[in-house]
């Protein structure tokens, strides 16, 4: 009887102490462009949550990499038009992060609807999340 009780108690302890891995999620994608003298400036942002964090002493550290693809109004896909790494450390658990991208589009880009795809990877777990948004280039 004691043996079964110890096995059950050990099993419950393991379950209670196990850490649930969160799922990486991108949300609130936005993009827009405004006209400049010789083209446009495109701004895009996406928020990210559910990433792994290393606890180092009293600090929490997250590391995300991102890539931005742009699909032009005539269907041409430009992969990796912007790339980067967000390496954030703060003294409390990080709830979410915002990733921003800013690009200059010259006058060779035609007016129309464009699609921005944000691909985010949690460097600590390898999880990926993808989200897109649309914007219009107008004269």
Show the residue positions of the predicted features.
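A short tyrosine-centered beta-strand micro-motif
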Residues: 112-119
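Surface-exposed loops/turns
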Residues: 38, 110-111
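Sec-dependent N-terminal signal peptides
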Residues: 6-9
């Amino acid at each position: 009887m004691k043996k079964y009780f110890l096995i059950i108690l050990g099993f419950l302890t393991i379950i209670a102490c196990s850490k649930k891995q969160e799922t990486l999620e991108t949300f609130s994608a936005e993009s827009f462009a405004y006209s400049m003298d010789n083209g446009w400036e495109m701004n895009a942002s996406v928020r990210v949550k559910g990433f792994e964090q290393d606890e180092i002493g009293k600090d929490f550290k997250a590391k995300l990499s991102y890539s931005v693809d742009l699909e032009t109004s005539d269907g041409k896909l430009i992969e990796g038009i912007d790339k980067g790494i967000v390496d954030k450390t703060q003294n409390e658990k990080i709830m979410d992060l915002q990733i921003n991208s800013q690009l200059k589009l010259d006058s060779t880009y035609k007016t129309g609807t464009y699609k921005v795809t944000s691909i985010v990877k949690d460097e600590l777990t390898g999880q990926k999340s993808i989200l897109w948004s649309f914007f219009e280039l107008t004269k």
